[in-house]
């Protein structure tokens, strides 16, 4: 099974990329993670294992996570005071689990803060309420990209929109 994790700040173009990938292959299962998933299953390892097992049972050739463990790490720290934040050690565990199911590819979708802010305002984003907050999120993703390139067990790509 191919596992593709698509990460990036609000307004970067993640969901647009995921929709394009889904159009290329009908044998794709996609899971868009939101803060409600974190609240429902606070344990990040269990949260992702449940979806990997489901994809495996469905015999999907590819599973796409629209957001994932890097978003958990960033947004939980910046927006929610770290209550359910994911640690670097937990990221390593989740990625090892992913590798036990198949190939892992991590794609960071990036854009300028100005472009992302315009998209967030256009669609009425509820979590990102200011450009300053988006700047913090963008800076955290830049650090996450560095971390992933150094330690991820999968292939890591950055796609600029």
Question: Each predicted region: which residue ranges?
Answer:
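Residue-level preference for the first positions of well-ordered beta-strands
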Residues: 3, 61-64
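Small-molecule kinase domains that catalyze NTP-dependent phosphoryl transfer to phosphate-bearing small molecules
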Residues: 91-95, 103, 110, 114, ...
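Conserved substrate/cofactor phosphate-moiety recognition/catalytic segment
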Residues: 9-12, 16-61, 71-75
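Hydrophobic anchor at the beta1->P-loop junction of P-loop NTPases
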Residues: 6
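Glycine-rich, phosphate-binding/catalytic loops in enzymes
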Residues: 22-23, 80-83, 123-126
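Conserved phosphate-donor/acceptor-positioning beta-strand/loop module used by diverse small-molecule
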Residues: 66-68, 87-91, 99-120
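A mobile, often basic/glycine-rich helix-loop segment
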Residues: 73-92
């Amino acid at each position: 099974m191919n596992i593709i994790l698509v990460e990036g700040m609000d307004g970067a173009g993640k969901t647009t990329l995921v929709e394009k990938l889904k159009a290329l292959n009908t044998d794709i299962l996609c899971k868009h993670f939101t803060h409600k998933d974190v609240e429902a299953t606070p344990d990040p390892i269990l949260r992702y294992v449940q979806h990997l097992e489901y994809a495996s049972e469905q015999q999907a050739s590819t599973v796409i996570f629209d957001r994932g463990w890097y978003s958990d790490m960033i947004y939980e720290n910046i927006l929610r005071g770290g209550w359910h934040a994911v640690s670097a050690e937990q990221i390593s565990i989740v990625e090892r689990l992913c590798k036990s199911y198949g190939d892992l590819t991590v794609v960071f979708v990036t854009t300028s803060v100005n472009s992302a802010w315009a998209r967030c305002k256009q669609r009425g984003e509820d979590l990102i309420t200011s450009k300053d907050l988006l700047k913090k999120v963008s800076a955290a993703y830049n650090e996450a990209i560095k971390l992933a390139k150094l330690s991820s067990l999968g292939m890591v790509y950055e796609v600029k929109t």
